[in-house]
Amino acid sequence: MIEVIKNDTGINWKKLHLIGFSIGSHLVGYAGRFLRLKGLLVPRITVLDPAGPLFEYQHPDTRIDPTDAEFVDVIHSDTNTIIVLGFGAEQQMGHLDFYPNGGYFQKGCEKFDISLKQYLVCSHYRSIRYFMESISSQSCFYEAYPCKSYEDFKAGKCLCPSEGCPVMGYHAKKPKTQQSIRYYLETRDVFPYC
């Protein structure tokens, strides 16, 4: 379908940006992989809390990975294991992997005035809200710090590199060097989250 859109609409391929949430994260990865095998590299894929169960720590052909596009950025917002009702993947799967609030449980999701259903999916869906806010806000940029762990980040042991810290969301840019680094940031518990 993407090939048809490219050929029939005159879309500017360099501006193509695929976005997937949960299981859809892996579907856009499959699309990117399929197009790459046909000689077309998708410029950017953003994945919002990619599904963890049945995908995490599996072969890269079965899930999103950095080879699926020129730039793959990932927001991990619900990385608890399925045993404790987490839906997202903790494993790094992109060029930039962002872990707001450590990636486990999002601020504001512990409120008692939400239904059980809302409680169960609150952290998982929060990645969508963060991404949407990164598009609509003119003053908020989710600056994230490279760090070995969330604990080190909270202890203030992480600094921005000389070129500055990357931002999470729509304005994310592919890093100049490919390193396996996690990026941490804090958010607010209510909208605006930044």
Predicted regions, residues:
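Generic structural signal for residues positioned in beta-strands
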Residues: 71, 97, 146, 182-184
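Extracellular secreted precursors and ectodomains with disulfide-bonded cysteine-rich loops/domains
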Residues: 107, 120, 138, 145, ...
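Generic structural motif recognizing short loop/turn segments at the entrances and edges of beta-strands
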Residues: 92-96, 141, 178-183
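Non-catalytic, well-ordered alpha-helical segments in soluble enzyme domains
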Residues: 120-141
